[in-house]
């Protein structure tokens, strides 16, 4: 009887060991699967991050120029009617630090030049390198509100402007960084006007529809 009891005990012990190994194997498998899932998620996150950084546009946010985005000329596109961008000399948030800023509606574009150590803030906007983005209106008979680079987006020449909203404004500028000193000519109109623009200028129209005359 004692020998039978020992055998039974040994069998029970062996059974317990086998069960432990089975449980450990299952747990190990789950751990590996879980680890693979995490790695996959990490890889996906890294891929998404790389895609976001190397994609054709820069998402809304605040960036330091030179470390997060390259200096250069960019095109900003509003993704809804509350689009806003701001270029600042520092991150103090003070009005004196603002170099240039503007509001724009969905589908409108603005040009901007940013330099190393600037800060660029994008709200409801996305930003493209100017070389990668051309703003081509469907027709030169009905050019919608935006900022256009003459010779790149629309041809030089004389344009007839027609006010489409109560606030109608046009502006010719030498560059899109100097919000005041870069302006060549500008005006508010109540109904219509003619404006001649030259190659390399930036032509901004707000609440206006433009038509190429010649």
Where are these regions (language model features)?
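N-terminal, intrinsically disordered, polar/charged segments of Gram-positive cell-envelope systems
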Residues: 25-67, 72-73
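Primarily secretory-pathway and cell-envelope proteins
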Residues: 51, 55-56, 79-139, 165-214
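Short, surface-exposed polybasic-aromatic patches that bind anionic ligands, especially phosphate groups
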Residues: 139-140, 145
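Extended extracellular/luminal ectodomain segments enriched in beta-structured repeat modules
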Residues: 69-72, 153-157
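Surface-exposed interaction/gating patches
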Residues: 154-166
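Membrane-embedded alpha-helical segments of small multi-pass membrane proteins
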Residues: 5-30
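Juxtamembrane low-complexity tails/linkers enriched in Ser/Thr-Pro and polybasic
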Residues: 1-3
């Amino acid at each position: 009887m004692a020998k039978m009891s020992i055998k039974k005990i040994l069998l029970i012990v062996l059974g317990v060991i086998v069960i432990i190994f089975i449980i450990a194997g299952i747990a190990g498998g789950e751990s590996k699967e879980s680890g693979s899932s995490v790695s996959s998620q990490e890889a996906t996150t890294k891929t998404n991050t790389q895609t976001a950084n190397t994609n054709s546009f820069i998402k809304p946010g605040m960036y330091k120029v030179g470390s997060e985005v390259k200096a250069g000329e960019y095109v900003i596109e509003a993704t809804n009617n509350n689009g806003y961008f701001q270029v600042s000399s520092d991150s103090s948030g003070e009005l004196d630090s603002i170099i240039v800023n503007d509001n724009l509606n969905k589908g409108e574009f603005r040009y901007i030049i940013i330099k190393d150590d600037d800060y660029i803030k994008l709200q409801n906007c996305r930003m493209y390198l100017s070389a990668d983005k051309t703003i081509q209106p469907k027709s030169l008979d009905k050019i919608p509100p935006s900022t256009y680079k003459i010779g790149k987006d629309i041809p030089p020449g004389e344009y007839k402007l027609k006010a489409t909203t109560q606030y109608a404004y046009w502006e010719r500028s030498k560059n899109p960084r100097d919000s005041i000193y870069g302006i060549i000519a500008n005006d508010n109109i109540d109904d219509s006007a003619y404006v001649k623009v030259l190659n390399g200028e930036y032509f901004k129209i707000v609440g206006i529809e433009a038509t190429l005359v010649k």
